[in-house]
Swiss-Prot record:
Involved in the biogenesis of TorA. Acts on TorA before the insertion of the molybdenum cofactor and, as a result, probably favors a conformation of the apoenzyme that is competent for acquiring the cofactor. GO terms for biological process: protein complex oligomerization; protein folding. It comes from the Bacteria. It is found in: Cytoplasm. It holds the Pfam family Nitrate_red_del. The keyword Cytoplasm applies. The keyword Metal-binding does not apply. This is Chaperone protein TorD. Its main location: cytoplasm. One of its GO terms (cellular component) is cytoplasm.
Length: 215
C-alpha cells in the first residue's frame, strides 16, 4: 500500500464515521466509546490538521458536555430527533432534495441523481436504512465506498478517473447543499452537538475538494 492509497483509506473511514453519526441516534454503548482513548486519539490526530482544528475541537467540546449530562444518551437522542426528524420548519432535514429542488418535496431530482450514482458504481444502499437516496448518511456512505473502489483500480488512468469522480460527486451532490444544511442545524440544534458534526462535515468536504483538485 502506497502513501496515497493509505490516505484514501483514512478519508473513507472519516466519511463512514460521519455517515454513522448522521444516520441514527447514538446508542449508550456507542456514546461510551466516544470517551475511550482510541476515539479521543483519533479526534486529537484529526485536529492536528490546521484546517480542521477549530471544527474538531468544537466537536470535542460538545462531546465533553454530552458526558456531563444526567441522562446523556436519552438527551442526545432527543437532540437528534429535534435536529433532523421534525418538519422543515423546525429541523435541518438531511435530504438534498429539501435544499436543491424548488418543489420542496422529498425524493425529488437530487434523490434520482443519487440513485444514478449508486447504480453507476454498483454500490447498494444498506437495506436496513430505509431512507430516500439523497439522505446525507447515504451520500457519505457512498463516498466512502467510492474511495475504497478507487484504490482497487488496476491502472493509473482508472485510478485518476475515480479520483475525479469523487471530486465531481462532492461538488455536485454534497457541497451544493450541505453548507445550508449546516447553517440550519446551527439554528435548530440547541445543545449543539449535531451542529458541531455538520460543521466538521462541511469543513472536511471543502478541504477534501482542495486535495482532490491538487491545490
Amino acid at each position: 500500500m502506497n502513501e496515497l492509497t493509505a490516505f484514501n483509506e483514512q478519508r473513507a473511514e472519516i466519511y463512514w464515521w460521519l455517515s454513522s453519526l448522521l444516520s441514527a441516534e447514538l446508542t449508550t454503548e456507542q456514546l461510551e466509546q466516544y470517551g475511550s482513548f482510541e476515539v479521543r486519539t483519533f479526534l486529537s490526530n484529526l485536529a492536528e490538521t490546521p484546517e480542521l482544528s477549530d471544527s474538531v475541537n468544537a466537536l470535542i467540546e460538545k462531546l465533553n458536555a454530552v458526558q456531563g449530562r444526567e441522562d446523556a444518551q436519552l438527551e442526545l437522542s432527543a437532540d437528534f430527533c429535534d435536529a433532523f426528524l421534525g418538519s422543515d420548519k423546525s429541523s435541518a432535514l438531511p435530504y438534498a432534495s429539501m435544499y436543491l429542488d424548488k418543489s420542496g418535496l422529498l425524493n425529488a431530482k437530487p434523490a434520482q441523481d443519487m440513485r444514478e450514482w449508486l447504480t453507476k458504481y454498483n454500490i447498494a444502499q444498506k437495506a436496513e436504512f430505509n431512507e430516500p437516496a439523497d439522505h446525507i448518511a447515504i451520500e457519505l456512505d457512498f463516498l466512502g465506498n467510492l474511495i475504497v473502489m478507487t484504490n482497487q483500480q488496476a491502472s493509473e488512468d482508472e485510478f485518476e478517473a475515480y479520483m475525479n469522480a469523487q471530486l465531481t460527486f462532492i461538488n455536485e451532490q454534497l457541497l451544493s447543499w450541505t453548507p445550508r444544511f449546516n447553517e440550519i442545524c446551527i439554528e435548530r440544534d440547541k445543545f449543539g452537538f449535531y451542529a458541531a458534526v455538520t460543521g466538521l462535515l462541511v469543513t472536511f468536504l471543502k478541504l477534501d475538494v482542495k486535495f482532490l483538485a491538487g491545490e
